[in-house]
Amino acid sequence: MEYSEMLIHRIKDLCRQRGGITVLRLAKMSSLRQSTLDNIIRGNTKDPRVSTLHRIALGFNMTLTEFLDFPELNDYVFEEEEEIINPAELKKHKKTERPASNAVLP
């Protein structure tokens, strides 16, 4: 299961646990636009901002830590998005770098 799918399940589970909160009501409780929340729940927003997740957590009267503390996410292994550089390639890059200037910046 992907990170975004886990967030969707978490939001839906919390809505159910709290008496069937609707997307519109959660948006109001979270001080978010309904379209923002809809995009997250529909999977259109794959990686919501921390500030958005924080607002959702506050809407549920939780801290961000509490909101993100659930088994699926705790067991999730995030993949590195950055390119891994071969050590030999790294040496090539170091050789072509210019020496640092001794000039003092104003």
Residue ranges and their predicted role:
Residues 5, 9, 34, 49-53:
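Short alpha-helical elements of helix-turn-helix
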Residues 16, 42, 72:
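Residue-level detection of the helix-turn-helix DNA-binding "recognition helix"
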Residues 1-25:
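A short, Lys/Arg-rich alpha-helix, primarily the initiator
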Residues 31-48:
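Recognition helix of helix-turn-helix/homeodomain-like DNA-binding domains
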Residues 39, 69-106:
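Short, charged recognition helix plus adjacent turn
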